[in-house]
């Protein structure tokens, strides 16, 4: 096996090219092993418009849907281990006002496990922010909405509901939940990578959540709102590989196929997935719309995060982000070959 520094240089070549060709403003790649070895490389800009700002290792990235795993799934597993909830509890056990005017509604029978593994009838996304910016009114709407039924899909709505459940069980707003160093809901804008010029908000987004629904829900929701530095994300990955974060049964839930290509919260390696070719069978990963991603290969004992601001200054560009993610993961698998 090559050294960590050699491995990351090889892995970073496609990212450097993406920056040089102007497809992505800035990118940070971080590697960490189960033994605690770590290496980080950065290239490009934290902001391209309205002025250029170089990207540094300490910059905050809007993690987007990495919130679902690093924050929401993590907190739910903790509640399970504390005996405060069970994975097969219906949401209505902890959110009694969920569809309270129709006791036979399908939403009242949805379980925590189904939402975590995206096995519900709920839609992928809904433009909730168009209904207003009062968080409590939006939460009430979400809970009483008669959602159109469809086949299971990867759904923000699943995790918005799980975020509400966490608040109900703990009695604490999501925004007040304690976070580890390197993770925050309120980053310094001056130290944050810019995302998109938001026509709805009328400004370039930097240091505030990019996701419109999370913004309208107060800045934090179960599906988005978390920011992290590369080291904050790597610290989280290392804690999972080190087996000290959760019990063995909980770790098995996170790394064992639940339905489709999903474990609880995470996606697991499968042919054609975003983590590239050559991942071990117990590799889990997740993506964020802003251009972020985290992958953890439990068998090899290595994790990597690719953090970009590919939506800056607009999401409507050909960034090639999915191909970049796959190529980066494929190069890692080649560098960390298993015997």
Question: What residues fall within each predicted segment?
Answer:
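Short, conserved catalytic-motif segment at the N-terminal edge
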Residues: 4-61, 84, 315
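Hydrophobic (often cysteine-bearing) scaffold residues that line and stabilize catalytic clefts
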Residues: 7-11, 63, 67, 72, ...
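Active-site SXXK
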Residues: 15-16, 35, 60-88, 162-167, ...
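Short loop/turn microsegments at loop-to-beta-strand junctions
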Residues: 25-27, 290-293
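Short, well-ordered beta-strand elements
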Residues: 39-41, 294, 301-310, 314
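Short, surface-exposed loop or secondary-structure junction motifs
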Residues: 40, 47, 102-283
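Short, glycine/proline-biased beta-turn/loop segments that scaffold the active-site neighborhood
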Residues: 86-103, 181
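Short, gly/Ser/Thr-rich active-site loops of penicillin-recognizing serine hydrolases
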Residues: 242, 250, 255-260, 271-273, ...
């Amino acid at each position: 096996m090559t050294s960590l520094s050699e491995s990351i240089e090889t892995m970073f070549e496609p990212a450097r090219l993406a920056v040089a060709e102007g497809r992505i403003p800035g990118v940070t790649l971080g590697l960490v092993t189960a033994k605690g070895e770590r290496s980080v490389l950065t290239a490009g800009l934290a902001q391209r418009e309205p002025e250029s700002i170089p990207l540094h290792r300490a910059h905050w990235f809007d993690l987007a849907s990495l919130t679902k795993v690093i924050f929401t799934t993590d907190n739910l597993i903790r509640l399970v281990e504390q005996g405060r909830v069970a994975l097969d509890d219906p949401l209505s056990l902890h959110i009694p006002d969920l569809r309270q005017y129709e006791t036979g509604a399908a939403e009242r029978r949805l379980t925590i496990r189904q939402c975590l593994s995206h096995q519900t009838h709920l839609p992928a996304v809904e433009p909730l922010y168009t209904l207003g910016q009062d968080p409590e009114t939006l939460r009430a709407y979400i809970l009483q909405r008669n959602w159109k039924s469809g086949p299971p899909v990867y759904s923000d709505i699943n995790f918005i509901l799980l975020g509400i459940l966490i608040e109900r069980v703990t009695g604490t707003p999501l925004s007040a939940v304690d976070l580890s160093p390197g993770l925050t809901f309120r980053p310094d804008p001056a130290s944050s990578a810019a995302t998109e010029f938001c026509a709805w908000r009328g400004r370039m987004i930097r240091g505030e959540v990019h996701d419109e629904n999370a913004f309208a829900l107060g800045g934090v929701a179960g599906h988005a709102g978390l920011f992290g530095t590369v080291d904050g994300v790597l610290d989280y990955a290392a804690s999972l590989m080190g087996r000290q974060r959760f019990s063995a049964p909980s770790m098995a839930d996170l790394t064992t196929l639940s339905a489709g290509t999903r474990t609880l919260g995470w996606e697991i390696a499968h042919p054609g997935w975003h983590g590239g070719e050559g991942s071990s069978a117990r590799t889990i990963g997740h993506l964020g719309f802003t251009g972020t991603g985290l992958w953890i290969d439990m068998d090899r004992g290595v994790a990597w995060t690719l953090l970009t601001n590919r939506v800056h200054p607009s999401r409507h560009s050909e960034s090639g982000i999915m191909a970049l993610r796959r190529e980066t993961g494929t190069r890692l698998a080649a560098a960390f070959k298993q015997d």
